[in-house]
Amino acid sequence: MQTLNRRNFPGRQHPDRVIQFGEGNFLRAFVDWQLDLLNEHTDLDAGIVIVRPIDSDFPPALDTQDGLYTTIIRGLNEQGEAVREPRLIRSVNREINVYRQFDEYLALAHDPNIRFVFSNTTEAGISYHADDRLSDAPPVSFPAKLTRLLYERFCHFDGAADKGWVLLPCELIDYNGVALKELVLRYAAQWELTSTFTAWLNDHNTFCSTLVDRIVTGYPRAEVEALQQEMGYQDTFWDTAEHFYLFVIQGPLWLAEELRLNKLDLNVRIVDDIKPYKERKVAILNGAHTALVPVAFLAGLDTVGESMNDALIGKFVEKTIAEEIVPVLDLPHDELTSFAQAVLSRFRNPFIQHQLLSISLNGMTKFRTRILPQLLTYRERHGELPARLTFALAALIAFYRGERSGEGDALQAYPLQDDAHWLERYSTLWAGVKENTVSLAELVNVVLRDADHWEQDLTQVPGLAAQVTEQLQTIVERGMRAAVEGYC
């Protein structure tokens, strides 16, 4: 069987126009996949040079396949139909290891055609390392590496106004472009670089904050043999992802023309502020996940897909989103409902098996950040508590009992993953309930009164403790399926 490379699979190669910090699965199935579509269907003509920002030889460089690799995009489309789309990605030209090829790395700054810089160096990547120096080859932190490269470009082109870059970090932190620019300017000051360089950074480089959204499941280890037979070649870099994707860029409108987004209808939005889109994602996608997990798991289900195909639990999630989350968000209603429908399709994706227990990690913090804001806003706007969101809180408290109904009358124990503070507190409280020394009302009040966690005393929210206690009582006495019926 043939090996995937440009000799065996010749085709068009694009000039270097994009630098990408990060070689991982996400960027390859998200940014590179979109750029490859733009290269095929428009005149973008942008080749990608990947810079490996860490000192590691694992996995091997994409150079072993001349930059070629295959994406398998699969899931439910907008019509609810299962789709599967293999694609040979041809837009990556080469990969540079900055620790072993530092001169080649700096040479990228000398290329007048380079225009865009993408990155995904993990949430910890946009960080400050005090010991980084201009003379390091390379510096440790990603922002310092980038500052060194930008300074090289500034010097090589003598501060030319038309040689600035558009920088689009994809790290999962709020206002990632703002954070990255702040650190670049910090290094410029620390290294005592010229004021003209700082002015060039500010005036002729565009740092965009972004929001990225796609579940990338990466290398499909169990399917490799079948994929090789289907595609007719060996690929060490298969990359799988869901059908849905969204790229929100906080930046100038002229970006649409530069990236040729005006010539191909991709799910990319160029906006003035990404905050409403971040709130939408956290509230609808992440919030629905967090509400679903304890309800579905205590109802005897184990995966997100299985839960959404369960008539009772699926209806609970749909109504929670439509009636209690969407109405309190500040974006056009049609955008919110469209995104909500996409989320439901993503949850039902038959190609992804999301284990509920794995999503349950740090559930208390997730409830505070993902659901509590909508719960409190709903009460403020409607004068009553949202019954399904409070039920999700009752279910979460029940979940931390650490056991669910199994075969017959047997109880099935399961691992809990959270902060030690909560694990110890719940263990004590539920032991007290079992021994009849703590009532459910007392348990709920202890949990809601923890202002260090909730950033307020939730027992002061009128009716909340009583409603959650009543719902928890129903779950304990009747079981989750009987308890949730009233909310479907």
Swiss-Prot record:
Protein's gene: uxaB
- Record carries keyword Oxidoreductase: yes
Q: Which family does it belong to?
A: Belongs to the mannitol dehydrogenase family. UxaB subfamily.
Q: The organism's lineage?
A: Bacteria, Pseudomonadati, Pseudomonadota, Gammaproteobacteria, Enterobacterales
Please name the source species.
Answer: Pectobacterium atrosepticum (strain SCRI 1043 / ATCC BAA-672)
Question: Which UniProt keywords are given for this protein, alphabetically ordered?
Answer: NAD, Oxidoreductase
Q: Provide the reaction this enzyme catalyses.
A: D-altronate + NAD(+) = keto-D-tagaturonate + NADH + H(+)
Please give the name of this protein: Altronate oxidoreductase
Q: Which GO terms describe its biological process?
A: D-galacturonate catabolic process; mannitol catabolic process
The pathway entry for this protein reads as: Carbohydrate metabolism; pentose and glucuronate interconversion
- Please give the positions of the paired cysteines in each disulfide bond: none
